[in-house]
């Protein structure tokens, strides 16, 4: 595999950089060349955050070029649209369905698009696929809303053609999280896997 590109986005405080590091470490342990990058200075709570994970046999530079992302993994729906130019034709947007309205929306200066409107933009304007589910609800079902990022990683692992196995990712989660949180993180991962399989018809 020459390269696989993931763009992870959302707002500060959602665990985006942790997710990027977990995926990068899993790819490294799987034997790939890995580059992980992030936009610095933007991770204050509720500020827009973007991280890049690139891995494969032929990967140079941490930044994913526009139009080259295989997947956009978004922790907040409208943030997926903010960075939609990164998605390649035929790529997949996996997003948490629960919104955190931007300041402009809260002030009444803009309207927040519906999930159906977002799906139309991704599929008709960018030739991608759009899938949204309430990852926060599943994280709470697992036992802790903080595991929303792990729910989304579980969903990502089911993406058609995704190069990393479930076990490769779970092993990194097990050795990365505090020991007392391993069980809740494993539950979160499995709930994300289940949700993705249902959406993808697997």
Curated annotation (Swiss-Prot):
Record's catalysed reaction(s): indole-3-pyruvate + 2 oxidized [2Fe-2S]-[ferredoxin] + CoA = (indol-3-yl)acetyl-CoA + 2 reduced [2Fe-2S]-[ferredoxin] + CO2 + H(+)
Keywords: Oxidoreductase
UniProt temperature dependence: Optimum temperature is 70 degrees Celsius.
Keyword Zinc: no
Pfam families, sorted: POR (PF01558)
Leader peptide range in chain numbering: none
EC number, UniProt record: 1.2.7.8
GO molecular function: indolepyruvate ferredoxin oxidoreductase activity
Enzyme class (EC, first level): oxidoreductase
PANTHER family: INDOLEPYRUVATE OXIDOREDUCTASE SUBUNIT IORB
Role summary: Catalyzes the ferredoxin-dependent oxidative decarboxylation of arylpyruvates.
Subunit structure: Heterodimer of the IorA and IorB subunits.
Name the UniProt record assigns to this protein: Indolepyruvate oxidoreductase subunit IorB
Species the sequence originates in: Thermococcus kodakarensis (strain ATCC BAA-918 / JCM 12380 / KOD1) (Pyrococcus kodakaraensis (strain KOD1))
Gene that this polypeptide is encoded by: iorB
């Amino acid at each position: 595999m020459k390269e696989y590109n993931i763009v992870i986005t959302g707002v500060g405080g959602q665990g985006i950089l942790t997710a990027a590091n977990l995926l990068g470490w899993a790819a490294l342990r799987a034997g790939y060349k890995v580059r992980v990058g992030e936009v610095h200075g933007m991770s204050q709570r509720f500020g827009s955050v973007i991280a890049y994970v690139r891995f494969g046999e032929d990967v140079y530079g941490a930044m994913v070029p526009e139009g080259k992302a295989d997947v956009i993994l978004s922790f907040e729906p409208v943030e997926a649209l903010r960075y939609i130019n990164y998605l390649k034709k035929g790529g997949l947007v996996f997003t948490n369905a629960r919104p955190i309205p931007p300041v402009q929306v809260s002030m009444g200066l803009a309207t927040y698009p519906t999930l159906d409107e977002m799906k139309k933009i991704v599929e008709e304007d960018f030739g991608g696929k759009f899938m949204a589910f309430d990852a926060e609800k599943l994280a709470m079902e697992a036992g802790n809303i903080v595991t929303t990022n792990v729910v989304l990683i579980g969903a990502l692992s089911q993406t058609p053609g995704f190069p990393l196995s479930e076990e490769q990712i779970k092993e990194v989660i097990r050795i990365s999280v505090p020991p007392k949180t391993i069980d809740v993180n494993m539950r979160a991962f499995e709930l994300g896997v289940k949700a993705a399989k249902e959406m993808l018809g697997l």
